[in-house]
Design a protein with these regions (language model features):
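An aromatic/glycine/proline-enriched structural segment found at the starts
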Residues: 210, 218, 247-315, 418
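N- or domain-start disorder-to-order transition segments that initiate the globular core
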Residues: 58-62, 66-82
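Active-site SXXK
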Residues: 103-117
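M16 family metallopeptidases and their MPP-like homologs
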Residues: 77, 82-98, 104-106, 122-166, ...
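Non-catalytic, conformational "gating/processing" segments within enzyme and secreted inhibitor domains
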Residues: 174, 181, 231-266
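N-terminal secretory signal peptides that target proteins for export/translocation
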Residues: 1-34
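Boundary at the C-terminal end of the N-terminal hydrophobic targeting segment
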Residues: 51-59
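Bacterial N-terminal signal peptides
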Residues: 33, 37-51
Length: 457
């Protein structure tokens, strides 16, 4: 049996002087599309780790940014250790921006972007990248859709030309749409409908967000996917795929001026689009009652209890709030030395595993949660009570200075390791910029982390 318990709000749960809720963790539902399948990827608590690498020896950022006349925002992150580059195009559009009744259209269009243009024949985009010695991929989230290639430095002009081409010149046939619809429906059956954990997660999200579109699955509801057609896809494409709704990030063995010149040549001729006047979404009302979602399924294996909370994201939090949450959850729920693991797994032996997560990257809000997998002969009710005990201990006692310092030190050590990847740098900057942050916000993050106190947590 899988048992999910969701509390969207704890009215009496106030761990910070400036907070209304204790906000806690994830980096969970991130839709990564390899065009062979819709998969869920967790990127963990190190989502902001790469910010440290953006600081030079004197603390100066290495990132350069500029904007073309047509509105295309460009970031360049030089990294000359190897003659390779990562190119990413981020569109400020995701599943939460879909028209009512058309769930899944953002992800559907992402698939269809690999079909063809007048320049690139149907199905040849990824093959062309591969023939040039590179790799490519794409993903859709509630807030963003992104496409990327990793290639040798001298192949950057080619892949930039290809990205600019499909930004403006996508061609779709009825056959393209019908074929891809079948692929996505099969993905949903395989990844969601046949997986009790995914079913529970989908239902918990729908219960957590009663009005906001974050409660709608990125892949879409089955009955609405079936109704998507060619005109739906082209309408979404024509409305949102534009240079003034996109961010180009290039990381690797390049210099800012050469990228700017190349981008002006490849993207500069694409006209901007009117009508992109912000992202207006329904607001989530205040929640006053807990909601419990329970799933019983013979395929589920051991009993699992999860608890979700609404939380601020880095884009929506008050100054210092999200940083305090990151460190709190490092202490509370990250790894075998966390409070929840030591209490439930080591001391009480009620769980085979336990932890937590903080989803900090949403444009409008974030999520947080705890989970525990029951040990033998432990009921869902006992496990739920045990999780509540850990949460109550945090509410009453907070964290110690030693715990905070250890969490901060481990985080910074992780930053150094994580920042070694140019693709992670490109992904991090692109995602944060596409969800309302600035380069200055990103560069200031390490110092804000250092300023977090025990009282903040």
């Amino acid at each position: 049996m899988l048992r999910g318990r969701l509390r969207a709000r704890f009215p009496d749960f106030n761990l910070r002087p400036y907070g209304k809720i204790m906000w806690i963790l994830d980096q969970l539902v991130y839709a990564l599309d390899m065009r062979a399948g819709f998969v869920l990827a967790s990127f963990g608590l190190a989502s902001l780790a790469v910010a440290v690498a953006a600081e030079g020896a004197q603390g100066a950022p290495r990132v350069s940014e500029f904007t073309l006349k047509n509105g295309l925002h460009i970031l360049v992150i030089p990294d000359h250790r190897a003659p390779v580059v990562t190119q990413m195009v981020w569109y400020k559009i995701g599943a939460a921006d879909e028209p009512p009744g058309s769930s899944g259209i953002a992800h559907f269009l992402e698939h269809l972007m690999f079909k063809g243009t007048d320049l690139i024949p149907n199905g040849e985009f990824s093959k062309t990248v591969a023939r040039n010695g590179g790799e490519d991929n794409a993903f859709t989230n509630h807030d963003v859709t992104a496409y990327f290639q990793r290639v040798a430095k001298d192949r950057l002009p080619k892949v930039m030309e290809m990205e600019a081409d499909r930004m403006a010149n996508l061609r779709l046939s009825e056959e393209d749409v019908a074929t891809e619809r079948k692929v996505i429906l099969e993905e949903r059956r395989t990844r969601v409908d046949n997986d009790p954990g995914s079913i529970l997660q989908e239902q918990m999200m729908a219960a957590l967000y009663t009005n906001h579109p974050y409660g709608i699955p990125i892949i879409g509801w089955d009955h609405e996917i079936r109704a998507l057609d060619r005109e739906d896809a082209l309408s979404f494409y024509r409305r949102f795929y534009a240079p003034n709704n996109a961010i180009l990030v290039v990381a690797g063995d390049v210099e800012p001026e050469e990228v700017k010149t190349l981008a002006e040549d490849k993207f500069g001729k694409i006209p901007p689009k009117d009508g992109l006047n912000g992202r207006i979404r329904p607001e989530e009302p205040a929640h006053s009652t807990p909601v419990k979602v329970t799933l019983e399924d013979a395929r589920a294996g051991r009993t699992t209890v999860q608890r979700y909370y609404l939380a601020p994201s880095y884009a929506s939090a008050e100054p210092g709030e999200a940083e305090a949450v990151d460190l709190l959850m490092r202490v509370a729920a990250a790894g075998s030395i966390s409070k929840i693991y030591k209490k439930l797994v080591v001391e009480d032996q009620k769980a085979a595993n336990a932890g937590g997560w903080y989803s900090d990257s949403g444009l409008d809000s974030g999520r947080l949660g705890f989970y525990a997998i029951a040990a033998k002969n432990v009921s869902a009710e006992d496990l739920e009570e045990a999780i509540d005990g850990v949460v109550e201990d945090l509410r009453q006692n907070g964290v110690t200075q030693e715990e905070l310092d250890r969490a901060r030190a481990s985080y910074i050590a992780e930053f150094v390791y994580t920042s070694d990847s140019q693709s992670r740098m490109a992904r991090h900057y692109g995602w944060r910029l596409a969800t309302g942050m600035t380069v200055a916000d990103i560069e200031a993050w390490p110092d804000r982390l250092r300023r977090v106190t025990v009282d903040d947590v």
